[in-house]
């Protein structure tokens, strides 16, 4: 892993050597099942078979490494176009799908990988950014339909990042009761007098300016009771303080 990082850092420092490049991060789909069912020796054999397939089906100069237990990284570099890289990636993934590892039962298990691809220089021009984006693309595959390789999509990334920030700020809102209340007077049509007030919940957290967003997250996360509790206590406290101030 350290050697892979060192080589990639050196390559990224020399754009003329990188050309059009793709960083592909891959995760073995069945490793945990093999380890749990047959033992780690057979899981190690599955890993070795994957490594052999990478070595035998990538062009000379391609940088390959095992990142962790079930994750592999491949850097295709020095190409003139994305299509040229895609041809090499297709050859590799097809070879992977045809490769098998023998199990103690005598059955042959096809290697299954989920992968994500980030492009240099379009998606990022440094090693850490490409690795982050390739990792994101890979986990999009793993959480949807395993056994595929997908390219990074900045639009999906931005939507997911915003959604995660919204969830994080909602947790912050619940923990700190980070809302305030405005009061809308309700008038009697007959007398024209104020007969009640409607408490309107607001938040100054950037992604939670809309009460509709807060309520949607509360329903999704089973936190409606918490919102009701916060509203009951804070709305009454705010109303009382406004009355005392003569508002």
Give each language-model segment a name.
Residues 6, 114-116, 139, 182, ...:
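PAS-family sensory domains
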Residues 2, 121, 136, 140-182, ...:
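C-di-GMP signaling machinery
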Residues 20, 128, 147, 195-198, ...:
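Short beta-strand edge/capping elements of PAS-family sensory modules
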Residues 65-67, 96-113, 142, 243-247:
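Catalytic core regions of nucleotide second-messenger enzymes
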Residues 230-247:
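Helix C-cap/alpha-to-beta connector motif
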Residues 40, 86, 90, 105, ...:
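Catalytic-core segments of nucleotide cyclases and related cyclic-nucleotide turnover enzymes
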């Amino acid at each position: 892993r350290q050697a892979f990082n060192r080589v990639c850092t050196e390559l990224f420092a020399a754009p003329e050597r990188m050309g059009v490049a793709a960083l592909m991060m891959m995760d073995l789909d069945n490793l945990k099942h093999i380890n749990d069912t047959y033992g780690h020796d057979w899981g190690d054999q599955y890993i070795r078979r994957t490594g052999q397939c990478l070595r035998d089906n990538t062009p000379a100069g391609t940088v390959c490494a095992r990142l962790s237990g079930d994750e592999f990284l491949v850097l295709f570099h020095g190409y003139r176009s994305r299509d040229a890289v895609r041809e090499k990636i297709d050859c590799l993934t097809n070879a992977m799908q045809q490769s098998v590892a023998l199990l103690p039962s005598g059955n042959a298990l096809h290697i299954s990988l989920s992968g994500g691809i980030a492009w240099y220089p379009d998606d990022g021009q440094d090693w850490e950014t490409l690795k982050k984006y390739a990792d994101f693309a890979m986990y999009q595959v793993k959480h949807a339909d395993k056994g595929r390789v997908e390219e990074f999509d900045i639009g999906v990334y931005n939507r997911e990042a915003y959604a995660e920030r919204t969830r994080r700020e909602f947790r912050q809102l619940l923990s700190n009761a980070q809302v305030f209340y405005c009061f809308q007077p309700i008038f009697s049509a007959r007398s024209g007098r104020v007969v009640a007030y409607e408490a309107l919940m607001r938040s100054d957290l950037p992604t939670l300016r809309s009460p509709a967003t807060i309520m949607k997250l509360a329903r999704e996360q089973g936190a409606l009771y918490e919102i009701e509790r916060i509203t009951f206590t804070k709305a009454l406290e705010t109303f009382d303080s406004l009355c005392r101030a003569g508002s």
